């Protein structure tokens, strides 16, 4: 079977898979290189309809061509042998597995032939070509993985746990509260009540301690809670995930091009899990470098971090000035004159600090409301409304473009 597969994969013809990450991973493991273009119907499906809930071969087969996989014979054989039909499939006799595999391949090809018609109808061939070019890169990234310093991760975990306990002890000492749960609002409410400090509440009246609220609070106890939470999240979410998923000193994270059953985005933005390497801490000047130092470049190589400078503001300014929205031309002129700082230019226009201008500007671009803005700035909703009104008065082009885009989308 392996030699037959090797001959098939050596040809330059298209190779059609459903969930190619799994199949190509095993083929690569067995030393079977793949020539020709790789086509993945599980990636094509969300191009055609990103609002589907299920993207398995069986679900898509029934949805589009009214044909699913018959697993009765495989399940009966597995039961007879006392095995799980999926997890232990490799232990079953080939007579049973072969029938299932043949059916699997045939359904994938039928689905692809149907998808070609839909790609044509929806004029999606250009985006299809793009995604299929990205696919081998994503597969190679997963297979290559990234080196991690496991020993350093383990020692850092211990260090951060000790640090968290020390901060929590200090919170207990300062407040007189004997039991403190960092992520339980009711527990933190007792700390604030003991110190006669006010705090936010949800619309239903429950205590609320958001990240922005704690960051903007002037009392030292709020900063202790914020720091303890950050330390806790760092070791319990990031470091634990690294230690759980590392294999022989490397991380091979799941990378999703589009939406699927296990995650992904409808916009086509890459997403990751096991672990999510896109959410490695960066903003904290102490913890950020600490966690990032756990990821090692290949021997003899070094890391390079590259990013577009103010990508969203530049695009916003381009379209706002082209549309002649109020105030956009001044920002466009600043860009043309040199390497302008969008948020500082807007801050100068409005008469607010750069951090506030950035929070509001990006917030409007992504549809943030008054409540979220108040939370981000650490002020009341009424105060946020006044700041937002001032922003829209002196930099109206941001809201004008956002509203225009929403009208087009609707």
What is each residue range found by the language model?
Residues 35, 52-55, 62-65, 70-287, ...:
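Conserved "right-hand" nucleotidyltransferase catalytic core of DNA-directed polymerases
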Residues 1, 312-349:
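Metal-dependent catalytic core segments for phosphate chemistry
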Residues 47-50, 99, 306, 334-337:
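Conserved, non-catalytic sequence blocks in retroelement Pol enzymes and Pol-derived host proteins
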Residues 13-19, 179-181, 307:
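Short glycine-rich phosphate-binding loop at a beta-alpha junction
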Residues 40, 307, 347:
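Active-site glycine-centered loops adjacent to acidic/histidine catalytic or metal-binding residues
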Residues 355-366:
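Short, amphipathic alpha-helical "recognition" segments used to contact nucleic acids or chromatin
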Residues 1-59, 63, 268, 283-288, ...:
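Conserved RNase H-like, two-metal-ion catalytic cores of nucleic-acid enzymes
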Residues 291:
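Cytosolic ligand/metal-binding cores
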